[in-house]
C-alpha cells in the first residue's frame, strides 16, 4: 500500500494540516447547509425534510438527556446535535472516495482517521467539561469536588487522563482500520482483472459495515461526552 502524506503549511511555529483543515471546513459547511435547509418553513405538523431533522434531534436528545438531566438539557441540545452530526460525517468521509496525487499527497480522508485530530477532539471535550463545571458551579466548588477527599486526587487525575485517551483511541482505531481495509481492497482490484469482481463485492460489503461502525462510534463519542459533562455539572453538594 502506497504511503500517503497530507499537505501542510507553516505559519510561524504553527503547522496546519491542509487536508484535515479542508475536511473540517467541509463538514461544518455540510452541517450548516443541512440544518438550514431542513429548518426552513417549519410547521407544527412536521413533514418531509423537517421530519428528518426532528428525528435526528429527538434521537440525540434521547440518549444524552439521561446523563445531562432535563435541568440543563435545553442549554446543550444543539451542541450535542452538532457534535453527533459532525462525528457521523467525519467518520464516513474517507469511505466516499480517495483523492491522492501521483507523488502520494492525500487530499481526502476521514479527519478522525488521524490520531492527532482525535486527540485534539478528545482534549477539547475534557476541557469543555471542566469549563462548564466552573461556569455552573463556580471555581471553588469545582476544585473542591475534584480534590476532596485528598487521597482520591491521584485517582481523579488518572481518571481524567484515561477518559481523554480512551475517547481518542477508540475513535481512531475504528476509523483508521476501516480506511486501511478499504485501501487494501481497492489495491486488490488493481492486481488482476479476475480479482475485480471479488474486490468489488468485498469492498461493497466492507463499506456497508464500516458505515455502520462509523455511526456507532459517533453515537459512543457523543454519549461519552454527555456522560463526562453530566458528571461535572450534576454533582450534588453536601
From Swiss-Prot:
Key component of the proton channel; it plays a direct role in the translocation of protons across the membrane. It is found in: Cell membrane. SUPFAM superfamilies: F1F0 ATP synthase subunit A. It comes from the Bacteria. The chain crosses the membrane at residues 15-35, 76-96, 111-131, 167-187, 208-230. It is a multi-pass membrane protein. One of its GO terms (molecular function) is proton-transporting ATP synthase activity, rotational mechanism. One of its GO terms (biological process) is proton motive force-driven plasma membrane ATP synthesis. GO terms for cellular component: plasma membrane; proton-transporting ATP synthase complex. Keywords: ATP synthesis, Cell membrane, CF(0), Hydrogen ion transport, Ion transport, Membrane, Transmembrane, Transmembrane helix, Transport. Coiled coil: none annotated. Belongs to the ATPase A chain family. This is ATP synthase subunit a. F-type ATPases have 2 components, CF(1) - the catalytic core - and CF(0) - the membrane proton channel. CF(1) has five subunits: alpha(3), beta(3), gamma(1), delta(1), epsilon(1). CF(0) has three main subunits: a(1), b(2) and c(9-12). The alpha and beta chains form an alternating ring which encloses part of the gamma chain. CF(1) is attached to CF(0) by a central stalk formed by the gamma and epsilon chains, while a peripheral stalk is formed by the delta and b chains.
